[in-house]
């Protein structure tokens, strides 16, 4: 590889940032993305690391199962629209110390930039999802998905109500996220409260919705994670359009028996708490 940008994990990270920007989910500096690197990723990127790593910064959170890991992360205050044309200032790689409570920049985030302000929240959720998936989960993605946010103004803010609405709005949804989605009430972004609330939801779900704020999605790779967010947002868009066209009247929908039939044929297990 002649540049770090040709390494698959970095190339995929940049592409996902641009995909989200093209969807319209990342106005200004909205949203953030982190990826937990494999050993092979780190080995491939190491020749491009800074000659001298920057100082350690305590996160205020701690996770034993992430000690010594490396993450690619978007930068605080950085715009997703600038990731592709200017990655060196927009994204970076951070190393976690052996106590699992501090990071230091080893590449990128040039000229004094820092990891996303939501990094502690991402970090806690990486810890939860790594444990829940036996290490398979590697991506945490937060975006301002327009129709998902719109639904948080009209639907009851419960896991059940949102999961059913999304499942019944697009046939693929019960296959893509059979466990449903979690919902968190409005909280101040970037704080410990929203990090804790989200990590509790992510023990059960691949995705959590932040009321009046956006979507938090996870997965084993960039394609699966972006696909999850895209599927949830498209289903929300369908539901918004149905409500708008019919004045709130829904004449027919995917029934609970239909959902069970989908689960049977596709070999997935639906969250029974969300079925009538």
Q: Where do the model's predicted regions map?
A:
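Glycine-rich flexible loops
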Residues: 1-276
């Amino acid at each position: 590889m002649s540049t770090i940008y040709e390494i698959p994990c970095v190339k995929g990270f940049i592409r996902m940032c641009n995909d989200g920007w093209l969807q319209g989910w990342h106005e200004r500096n909205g949203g953030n993305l982190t990826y937990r690197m494999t050993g092979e990723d780190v080995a491939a990127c190491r020749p491009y690391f800074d000659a001298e790593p920057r100082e350690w910064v305590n996160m205020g959170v701690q996770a034993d199962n992430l000690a010594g890991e490396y993450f690619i992360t978007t930068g605080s205050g950085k715009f997703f629209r600038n990731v592709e044309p200017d990655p060196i200032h927009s994204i970076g790689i951070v190393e976690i110390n052996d106590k699992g409570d501090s990071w230091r920049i080893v590449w990128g985030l040039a000229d004094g930039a820092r990891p996303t302000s939501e990094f502690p929240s991402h970090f806690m959720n990486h810890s939860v999802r790594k444990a829940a998936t036996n290490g398979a989960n590697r991506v945490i993605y937060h975006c301002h998905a327009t129709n998902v946010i719109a639904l948080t103004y009209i639907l009851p803010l419960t896991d059940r109500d949102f999961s059913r609405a999304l499942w019944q709005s697009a046939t693929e949804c019960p296959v893509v996220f059979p466990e449903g989605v979690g919902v968190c009430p409005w909280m101040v972004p970037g704080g410990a409260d929203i990090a804790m609330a989200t990590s509790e939801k992510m023990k059960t779900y691949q995705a959590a919705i932040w009321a009046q704020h956006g979507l938090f999605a996870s997965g084993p790779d960039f394609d699966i994670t972006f696909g999850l967010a895209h599927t949830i947002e498209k289903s929300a868009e369908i539901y918004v359009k149905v409500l708008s066209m019919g004045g709130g009247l829904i004449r027919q929908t995917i029934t609970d028996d239909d959902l069970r039939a989908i689960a049977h044929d596709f070999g997935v297990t639906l969250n029974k708490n969300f079925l009538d």
